[in-house]
Amino acid sequence: MKKKRRRGSGRSINSPQLVSVTHYEVTDKPILDPDYRRLPDYVKNSIERLHREAQIRPRKAILELEALQEQYPHIPQVYNYLAIAYSRIGEIAKAEAIALEGMQVNPDYLFTRLNYAEFCLYKKDYAKVAEIFDHKFDLSLLYPKRKLFHVSEVVNFMGLIGLYFYETQRQDLAQQYYAVLQRLAPNDPMARRLKRRLSPGLFVRLWKRLTRWSASNQTDGI
């Protein structure tokens, strides 16, 4: 299934300073890079299995992933899954170093950029986040030769950039990115994550109102 994004369709993001009107197709069919396709089937099967194991049995996965990293240093998925595994066991600095190395070795692979950008976002290094994407916040600007993207690429990119805009006090742009996620994948974890930032829960809203009310009363009493 392919979903085409056209000018003026309501799925386009248009902000003259930051992004262009997007024009590319979105598919849910796998898009595999040539290096990955050339791998032996048993290696591809191992990488897919290790993606799951990095999250549920990270220590076991690390041993296999490090062996694959040494043998196939040009395969970006290995770096991403290895970074996930180290994050799961609490070795955040090691995970970040691997994510950075993965991006440096595979600079054109979107998910290595996204993976390292997550660490920078967590550290509130927002200037670095923008630098990672070359200050291009639209996939058609970042990859001008590509006309087709997998839905997971679009969702994760839109979600992370939406979070970046939210954290840098540009909620209007964050809302635009969230609107795209709502149309494309409203139940995706990244869409829900951005929604939580843009629409804090009832308790948070009540707490803010109580804080403002308390501050107002203190001012009136002066």
Regions found by a protein language model. Name each.
Residues 67-68, 101-102, 136, 181:
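Canonical positions in the second alpha-helix
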